[in-house]
Amino acid sequence: MILTIDIGNTNIVMGCFHKDQLLLLERFSTEQDSTSLEYATIIREMLDLHEITPAQIRGGIISSVVPSVTNTVREAAEKFTGARMLVVGPGIKTGIKLAVDDPAQQGSDLIVGAVAGVHSYPVPQIIIDMGTATTVSVINRDKAYIGKMILPGVAVSLNALSGKAAQLPYISLEKPKKLIGSNTVDSMKSGILYGNAGAMDGLIDRINEELGEECTVVATGGLAGVITPLCRHEIILDEDLLLKGLLILYYKNCGNEKE
């Protein structure tokens, strides 16, 4: 089995694959002050929950946008499983051409998503990742990563609104019954949810116009399932996209034997 770990700014998503089958999918908070022992305890609990033993893990791969946590989680996973953990970074084979000004500045999560996107869906392609930040990546018909847009994530926007406006409460993100809100809470929900959906539709239109052709659109990330149903464009929701990309990169760099 292969352990896949995606370290984000807010959450860490962990998966475990047997061949191409995802057997485990768990999410826990990213804590920059946690020790390798504390993370090892979490990993152990997650594997125990799914009745997976350390001996069954023959390797793993980690993608991270939080450098201060990367080595801590890697040490935790290696210490508990005894298997080597590959970290996505410079020198790793991706099979993706990075047609951008500085390839070294591209986040590993974006590269992992692009690898999975190209492997699974037609190009040209737009990949929307809705996490702490929302990123909109573009892959052209030659399967080259040509750039991206970055905007505040849904939760970040909501927290900023509630935190800076004294009379606006903190709210949960359920779809309101109608677009035009008749009370403060529904008005905020409508603005955040439909506003983000409208932003995605607008960016998709502009990207298609700039490329001169229609793109396949794929969405992933913690809040993609909330926003994409409100978009007018057809968007493929793939919540496991990054874990699939990590598995592809593991096989590409560590051999193709699938166990």
Please state what every model-predicted region is.
Residues I139, A144, L151-E210:
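Active-site rim beta-loop-alpha module in soluble metabolic enzymes
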Residues M1-V87, I92:
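N-terminal glycine/serine-rich phosphate-binding loop of ATP-dependent small-molecule kinases
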Residues G95-Q125, G245-G255:
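Conserved phosphate-binding catalytic cores of ATP/NTP-utilizing and phosphoryl-transfer enzymes
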Residues I52-Q106, D142-G147, G153-V154, S182-L193, ...:
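Short beta-strand-loop/turn "lid" adjacent to the catalytic site in phosphate-handling enzymes
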Residues D48, I52, E78, G82-A83, ...:
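Generic secondary-structure signature for well-ordered alpha-helical cores
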Residues M1-L25, G117, V123-Y145, L161, ...:
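Gly/Thr-rich phosphate-binding beta-strand-loop-beta motif of the actin/hexokinase/Hsp70
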Residues I111-V112, A166, L193, G225, ...:
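Glycine-rich phosphate-binding/hydrolytic loop that grips phosphoryl groups
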Residues F28-D33, P90-G91, I150-V156, D240-I248:
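Short, acidic/turn-prone active-site loops that include or flank metal/cofactor-
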